[in-house]
């Protein structure tokens, strides 16, 4: 469903468009046979220029997948012309052979684009993978798919939509966004991720595009500021992937250089909306939960406390059962390594006070948590800092999906 809202500077936000909404980009998504299911599994995003500036942020997991290592290396130039993404296999924990597979994939994309008429080098190609950890990719199918996908590229809605479908794993719907600035420049994006969503980006692949004229350093600033307040604050299950990658490419096709503040704002809004879509489609989700800690001594304390609550399985199962068990929330925040006074803690569910000065209110057990959106707010009453984490409940379906993922 198309979603249009008005945000800062009269920018239009639409979910029916994605990476090809900005001028200068084409994309495609095809079935290469990587997935046993026969679902689409190979995507390509191509920057037609005239500029090729790029930036990226990656998982902080020490066990990094081969495509992450490859893409970190090529991004040292601050330039990208293409991103090739596969679902159906993570190419993680595959050793030197897996890294060579990523390199070979980039070379194949460069060769196919060059044959298509756009001279491209492997060092200009980012590689992203998602799926089961520990197995090498079927390179015969990957390389055949690379040769085919170049001829399927399209601009407009079609190419971006096909690409967004092709990167899905346990996702049930594609995630896309486009922000059209009134000053005639655009930011678009697509993301995937439904499980292993935790900070250090969440488990996800995300490609963002813009037709603004932007230097790599400015892109890097915008992306890092955005991810720190969006993807890094989406925490579904506390598990951090080996493959997390967020890339931002700029074509310069609009001819417009926006102020840094406007670029920062647009990228953050795009990331924030994609985060909301990822949260809504998380594995086994029945409740979308927002955990906010206010009154903390510092921003770091607020973030740590909110994350402690969001990751607590007893809190998450209580939310799943629509049980207003506020004691579990206080028990969780009490374990956070932050400054707090238990006799000053206040808390609410969906705006209804359930705890004041560390003691439950008379109607605390009567709060209705049967709605799909749950807001948990804890006031430490120590300082002025605040932070919010997005999470979900913990359902039977989540356990079932993740107990048989590799079988």
UniProtKB/Swiss-Prot annotation:
HAMAP family: ArgJ (MF_01106)
Biological role stated in the UniProt entry: Catalyzes two activities which are involved in the cyclic version of arginine biosynthesis: the synthesis of N-acetylglutamate from glutamate and acetyl-CoA as the acetyl donor, and of ornithine by transacetylation between N(2)-acetylornithine and glutamate.
Pathway: Amino-acid biosynthesis; L-arginine biosynthesis; L-ornithine and N-acetyl-L-glutamate from L-glutamate and N(2)-acetyl-L-ornithine (cyclic): step 1/1; Amino-acid biosynthesis; L-arginine biosynthesis; N(2)-acetyl-L-ornithine from L-glutamate: step 1/4
Site residues (Cleavage), renumbered to this chain: 202-203
GO molecular function, one term: L-glutamate N-acetyltransferase activity
GO biological process terms, semicolon-separated: L-arginine biosynthetic process; ornithine biosynthetic process
NCBIfam families named among the record's database cross-references: ArgJ (TIGR00120), PRK05388.1 (NF003802)
Name assigned to this protein: Arginine biosynthesis bifunctional protein ArgJ
CDD domains listed in its UniProt record: OAT
Subcellular location: Cytoplasm
Organism: Mycobacterium leprae (strain TN)
InterPro entries, sorted: Arg_biosynth_ArgJ, ArgJ-like_dom_sf, ArgJ_beta_C
Gene Ontology cellular component list: cytoplasm
């Amino acid at each position: 469903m198309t979603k249009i809202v008005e945000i800062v500077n009269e920018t239009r936000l639409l979910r029916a468009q994605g990476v090809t909404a900005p001028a200068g980009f084409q994309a495609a998504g095809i079935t290469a046979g990587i997935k046993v299911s026969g679902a689409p599994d190979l995507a390509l995003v191509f920057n037609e220029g005239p500029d090729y500036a790029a930036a990226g942020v990656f998982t902080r997991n020490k066990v990094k997948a081969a495509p992450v290592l490859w893409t970190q290396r090529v991004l040292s130039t601050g330039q990208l012309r293409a991103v090739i993404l596969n679902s159906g296999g993570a190419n993680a924990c595959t050793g030197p052979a897996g890294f060579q597979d990523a390199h070979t994939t980039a070379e194949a994309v460069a060769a196919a684009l060059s044959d298509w008429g756009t001279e491209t080098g492997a060092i200009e190609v980012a590689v992203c993978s998602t799926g089961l950890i520990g197995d090498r990719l079927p390179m015969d199918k990957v390389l055949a798919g690379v040769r085919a996908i170049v001829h399927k590229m399209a601009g407009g809605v079609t190419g971006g939509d096909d690409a967004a479908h092709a990167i899905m794993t346990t996702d049930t719907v594609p995630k896309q966004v486009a922000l059209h600035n009134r000053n005639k420049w655009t930011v678009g994006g697509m993301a995937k991720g439904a499980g292993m969503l935790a900070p250090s980006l969440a488990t996800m692949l995300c490609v963002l595009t813009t037709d603004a004229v932007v230097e790599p350093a400015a892109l890097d600033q915008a992306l890092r500021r955005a991810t720190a307040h969006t993807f890094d604050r989406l925490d579904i299950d506390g598990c951090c992937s080996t493959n997390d990658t967020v890339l931002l490419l700029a074509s310069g096709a609009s001819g417009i250089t926006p102020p840094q503040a406007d670029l920062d704002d647009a990228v953050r809004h795009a990331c924030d909306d994609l985060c909301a879509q990822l949260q809504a489609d998380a594995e086994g989700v029945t409740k979308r939960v927002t955990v906010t800690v206010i009154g903390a001594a510092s921003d770091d304390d607020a973030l740590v406390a909110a994350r402690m609550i969001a990751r607590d399985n007893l809190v998450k199962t209580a939310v799943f059962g629509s049980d207003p068990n506020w004691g579990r929330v206080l028990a969780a925040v009490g374990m956070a390594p932050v400054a707090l006074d238990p006799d000053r803690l206040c808390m609410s569910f969906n705006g209804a006070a359930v705890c004041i000065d560390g003691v439950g209110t008379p109607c605390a057990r009567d709060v209705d948590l049967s709605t799909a959106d749950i807001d948990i707010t804890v006031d430490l009453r120590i300082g002025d800092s605040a932070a919010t984490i997005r999470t979900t409940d913990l359902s039977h379906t989540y356990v079932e999906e993740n107990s048989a993922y590799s079988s």
